[in-house]
């Protein structure tokens, strides 16, 4: 028993370090829920009854959400979700008729985006004159409402089973 205890304690530091690295990798890749300061942005369709306004100009499109997400990333967002769907490197935001598909699930408007990061930087990225969100609101009449929060939560990624067909891991030393 003493030998087994010795071996277990000898490797415990290595095991703890590996577990710590796994948790860090999960965090950086969106596989853990996170909490912190940031903003919540609600984006929804133009509700104007103006018959002159084309229906395609009255609805929020996938590209609108993609541009908003990119603006938030550029402003330093550390974690983002749209209607509860965590945005990670393999997330897709694509048109699905009057809806959008995120991580393989179809979601309707209104679109609620939560981004964690510097509240002021993120808020400015969606409210200042000249930003895409400002244009959506003031040129196209979309509802774009942003609010800051000190204790927002972005859920962990739960989505599609991503399968690689072409990419292979390059081992260290290989070219």
Give a label for each model feature.
Residues 20, 34-38, 75, 82, ...:
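Extracytoplasmic
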Residues 26, 45-47, 86, 158:
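Short, well-ordered turn and helix-capping elements at secondary-structure junctions
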Residues 42, 114, 153-155:
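Residues in well-ordered beta-strands of folded domains
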Residues 47-134:
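Soluble extracytoplasmic domains of inner/organellar membrane proteins
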Residues 120-175:
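Extracytoplasmic/luminal low-complexity segments enriched in Pro/Gly and acidic/polar residues
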């Amino acid at each position: 028993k003493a030998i087994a205890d010795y071996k277990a304690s000898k490797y415990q530091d290595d095991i703890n370090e590996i577990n710590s690295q796994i948790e860090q990798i999960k965090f950086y890749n969106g596989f853990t829920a996170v909490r912190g300061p940031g903003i919540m942005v609600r984006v929804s369709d133009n509700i104007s009854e103006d018959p002159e306004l084309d229906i395609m100009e009255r609805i929020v499109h996938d590209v609108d959400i993609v541009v908003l997400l990119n603006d938030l990333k550029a402003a330093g967002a550390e974690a983002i979700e749209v209607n509860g769907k965590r945005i990670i490197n393999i997330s897709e935001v694509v048109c699905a008729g009057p809806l959008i598909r995120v991580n393989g699930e179809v979601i309707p408007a209104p679109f609620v985006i939560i981004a964690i990061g510097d509240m002021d930087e993120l808020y400015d990225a969606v409210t200042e004159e000249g930003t895409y969100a400002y244009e959506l609101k003031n040129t196209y009449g979309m509802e774009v409402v942003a609010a800051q929060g000190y204790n927002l939560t972005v859920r962990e990624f739960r989505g599609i089973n991503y399968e690689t067909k072409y990419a292979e891991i390059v081992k260290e030393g290989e070219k």
